[in-house]
Amino acid sequence: MRMPKSATGPSGSLPAGPGDAPSVTTAAPGLRLRAGARLGSLIRRHWLMTALLLAGLVLRVLAQIAYRPALLYIDTLKYLYNAWPGTDPLGYKGVLQAILLVGNLQAVTAVQHLVGLAMGVGIYVVLLRRGAPRWLAALAAAPVLLDGYELQTEQTIMPDVWFEALIVAALVLLLWHPRPRPRAIALAGLALGLSVTVAQAGEILILPAAIYAVVAAGSWRRAVGGAALMCVSFAVPILGYMSISDAVSGHFWLSRSGETSIYGRVAMAADCATLKLPSYERALCPTAQQKQKLGADGLDHAPNSPLTLYVAPPGMSQTGIVQNFTEEVIKQQPLRVLGDTAADAARLFAVTRVTSPGDTPISRWQFQGHYPSYQNYIRTSRDNVIIVGLHLQNPAPGGPSYVYQPLDASMGGKADVIRPLAAFLRSYQLNGGYTPGPLYLAATVLGLIGTLALVRRRIWAVGRDRELALACCLFFLTAAAILVFSDIPEFSWRYQLPAIMTLPPAGALGLALLLARLGDRRRRVAVAGPDATAADDAAADDAAANGVAASPDAAGTRTNGTTAANAATDKGVAGTSREDAAPRI
């Protein structure tokens, strides 16, 4: 019996009912085609970021192949072997132990390279969500992806990459929505607190994060609650780490440095001839020759520095004496200390990167054509076995101060440098493959402009402009806080790395805000004329002063054409002003 035509499919078969599964042979190719089309469309829309991401991936693969199993630094030994009590917390040691359970040091650097790529993607996406155009968001992420100093750090067994990643994670969480949600605030606080267990300089980051939680809240109730939640979640990992430290070592602290950590900085700045000090503290004053030769880092750590050679009078605390010395220098000569710190902070904007007298050599953060060695700490044998020197805490009188042993075979054992690749990476890094100082300066100026825009009342009346300015403020304040705070103990090019993932995004957001404002003004002039634009601006200021959003009816000079022109900015710089919405990515 023939079925009615209405009950059959195009080939005479029964049509698929609501409960019937689609044919695998026909559905799978269609799904693959649609997935491929979506991927192709995504790549076309984000072609610049895709190209930068691929370039960053290639550079990281080359670094991974060129230096095996990984690059080691002096401080690496305290994380691998507990070689000496560190001046930084040991949170990074937990990361190392987790990865070394399943791989060697090469696996550690592979993960660190992936973290570097993830930071670039995170910066790009969050800038898009806050209204930056694609090309500008991609350029803001480029330094993280392509900077040679960042690549070298990722290839080194050091905590810097994880410190940066935790900062980026916190910023992304806070900026994911125009008004940060309680869960995002709590997670961001935890990320920043964890950053302190990796590098103690992260302590300062609670300030810009709490300020943003207050300013972006939208109401006093949400502001107070957000700031309190941020501080509590920030404190949780820090107190947990200090409790573990107390249980293990008997010291409820983050690190052993304490109040003596800025001795090198203040001793470099001190004019001891005019200082009023007790006679027993005079020995802590370095000579001009010691300042020139040792610098702040050497004054803190060198075996021939006044701090290392100092012996406190009987019955007096050496730590207390050093603390009093630093306090007296700061009290009596604050401008000298501030001047030295400011001068070092400004070195980030220099056209070229050089090692000044007393600096930690910048070559330590540059790719070398051979496996790097450090006297008494790291060297390679004739058969390329990595030899590490572990400093003895209590050496026997007249005995050796170091004990030497090969790097554990489970960690990688032998050094293997592919010299052509190493030479390429070194040439890339030294010949333009880094973020130049003038670019940092431009980003700083634009970030400052975007941050100061928040003092204008009309910024708060336009959702898009408010979101751009607030995001710019968070990136800029984070950059300023961490860079200046890191330079207080001493200057090192290593400590400038957080600028890579904070200053360019701040500058990009500041520029996006300027472009948005300029585009709005041009469209209003084109539609309604210059006189209408002036009246429109005045109406917007009045609306902002009254606490309401600017609307087309707020000024009689606005026309339907002007409103349409302003709405069209979503194609370029603008995002949406609704709290839960974001521009299409």
What are the residue ranges of the model-derived segments?
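Membrane-interface anchor segments at the N-terminal boundary of transmembrane helices
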Residues: 44-47, 103-114, 337-475
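Transmembrane signal-anchor helices characteristic of membrane glycosylation enzymes that use polyprenol
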Residues: 45-71, 145-146, 233-244
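Extracytoplasmic catalytic/substrate-binding loops of multi-pass membrane glycan-assembly enzymes
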Residues: 66-79, 84-95, 99-106
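Multi-pass, polyprenyl lipid-linked donor-dependent membrane glycosyltransferases
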Residues: 74, 108-115, 142-174, 182, ...
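Loop-to-helix entry region of an early transmembrane alpha helix in multi-pass inner-membrane enzymes
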Residues: 90, 94, 102-121, 153
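Membrane-interface transmembrane helices that cradle and orient dolichyl/undecaprenyl
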Residues: 130-131, 170-185, 213-217
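Membrane-interface alpha helices of multi-pass inner-membrane proteins
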Residues: 141, 185-199, 233-237, 241
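Membrane-proximal stem/loop segments at transmembrane-domain junctions that anchor or position
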Residues: 255-410
